[in-house]
Curated annotation (Swiss-Prot):
This is Chorismate synthase. The gene is aroC. CDD domains: Chorismate_synthase. GO terms for cellular component: cytosol. One of its GO terms (molecular function) is chorismate synthase activity.
Amino acid sequence: MSGNTLGKLFTVTTFGESHGPALGCIVDGCPPGLALCETDIQIDLDRRRPGKSRHTTQRREPDQVQILSGVFEGKTTGTPIGLLIENVDQRSRDYDKIKEQIRPGHADYTYLQKYGLRDYRGGGRSSARETAMRVAAGAIAKKYLAERHGVKIRGYLAQLGPIRAERFDWEIVEKNPFFCPDPDKISELEAYMDALRKEGDSIGARINVVATGVPPGLGEPVFDRLDADLAHALMSINAVKGVEIGVGFAAVTQKGTDHRDPLTPEGFLSNHAGGVLGGISTGQDILASIALKPTSSLRLPERTINCRGESAEVVTTGRHDPCVGIRATPIAEAMAALVLMDHLLRHRAQNMDVQPSLPSIPAYPGGGG
């Protein structure tokens, strides 16, 4: 299996399976001298960690990260950073009854078609459990971007099923299990998820990510456009079926006079482009949005086939998230951070001596909500 590495200068390679002994990753290309300890990484891992509320999977993984290399006396050395998280709450017996069945909506069918075998225990490598290492690596990128360049990356739940956030308060996001910015929607979300759990069904969600303080000039103008790499990274998250940058698909109904972002000496007057023009950052907030499908692991029966291609019925009895979007906010933040970190280092390597004659102008003040 190839395709386990992201990035060109700041690279992240992950390994491990849902029910294996551990998950791990190698972060290469981190500049030396960054103060780093396990606590710096654990903060984001705890935000993603399963089993924290009744609305997520009850698999209880502490996700305690270990730094194996690349840090000496509390600072990065510039050598590869090895990270490890042990799996401690696997319950593989939950999957014994379905090991011969192909779960609809999962990677069972495609893995068997591609590799001729699959790890039926929780999906193996295709499980969202793998994203723990993305969050761990992303925490390093977020710390560097914030401390060295003033870049802040935050996300929130914009919509869960039919429930949309209508008010916006960053202070509320970290104070509820949904990462929802609208205090008036929390009780509605809780009631909706309680009813959904009783039904045994699942639901999709939308997560928005905002990166502020991104300098202009990041991104390459053709195949490695900043927005293209962001879309690639965000689309690689399990269950993501759609990505938007800026207003995204709403641009279809906008006229050019509505969509273009006017410039004045005092700053931009809008940010429909989401902080990227021509594949290069403008200095405005980077705005990205992802749509996550409802999980297909349900205790409701569904038609399928078995490993011999015969008709069968499947009921999944393992522990699963009824809405994967509830825990996706720190994952989306991490993927955005990894892309921005990589492009910042690439820009510095090629363009550090460039002195633009054109002055930078301020970002549109309403571009991050």
